[in-house]
Amino acid sequence: MSLRVRQIDRREWLLAQTATECQRHGREATLEYPTRQGMWVRLSDAEKRWSAWIKPGGWLEHVSPALAGAAVSAGAEHLVVPWLAATERPFELPVPHLSCRRLCVENPVPGSALPEGKLLHIMSDRGGLWFEHLPELPAVGGGRPKMLRWPLRFVIGSSDTQRSLLGRIGIGDVLLIRTSRAEVYCYAKKLGHFNRVEGGIIVETLDIQHIEEENNTTETAETLPGLNQLPVKLEFVLYRKNVTLAELEAMGQQQLLSLPTNVELNVEIMANGVLLGNGELVQMNDTLGVEIHEWLSESGNGE
């Protein structure tokens, strides 16, 4: 079944967005088809960020309705072009976010040369402007979404192994943490480091501006001897917490983050980003490890 997707013309969409913004500020702005009668002149800024059309006869009529007819018949509308080119600010732009250091004025063309489609019609202090192209509206900040949260995980270490080992792991085994570390992650981004203290943890460094990419890849040879030798990265997650932006900023000020009671009894074991089990954080001789309490084998029977 094919999807019926509504097509949107980006040019007209930008014109419509600007029309809505102008109307919100009390200025009349409409999307409509211009008349193809008479002569037209295309204007733009030097950077070509916007372009618009004017009808010189309409501008003369706006200035002096009584003289407009005689002026057009005498060819006076052609004088509008050099006047526009010679005047530094011939009119005030009716769209607030537009600017123009230098106006580019093209030669008059007949109405048949106007582009297809609707144009945005807005009145300036000199006459009507018919905008053909407009840039995007400036972004308006809506403040922080207070209900939005980010998932943090506090990692105490990792171990590199191979796929063949996973099939031999069972409940009661102890997975040793080969690389001890205390790092804070949000999704695949490393935010900083933390220290474990009595009653919780303290985030020592929190760099939100320069977030590092987590490297989930393991150095391997160019060719693998078999699927069982595929690399696996085990990650041991001490704690997870969803935080607001304000809470995240507070962590960077080394505030104490309280941990749930017995958090050491439920350390998550991730393999290449997938949760495979959990267990208790233990220390075997001089090496930290996790004694497995729950394990999801590849057969899915939990053994």
UniProtKB/Swiss-Prot annotation:
Official protein name in the record: Surface presentation of antigens protein SpaO
Endoplasmic reticulum in keyword set: no
TM regions (residue ranges): none
Natural source organism: Salmonella typhi
Superkingdom of source: Bacteria
Alphabetical list of InterPro entries matching this protein: FliN-like_C (IPR001543), SpoA-like_sf (IPR036429), T3SS_OMP_SpaO (IPR003283), T3SS_SpaO/YscQ/SpaO (IPR013385)
Entry function: Involved in a secretory pathway responsible for the surface presentation of determinants needed for the entry of Salmonella species into mammalian cells.
GO biological process: bacterial-type flagellum-dependent swarming motility; positive chemotaxis; protein secretion by the type III secretion system
Keywords: Virulence
Recorded family membership: Belongs to the FliN/MopA/SpaO family.
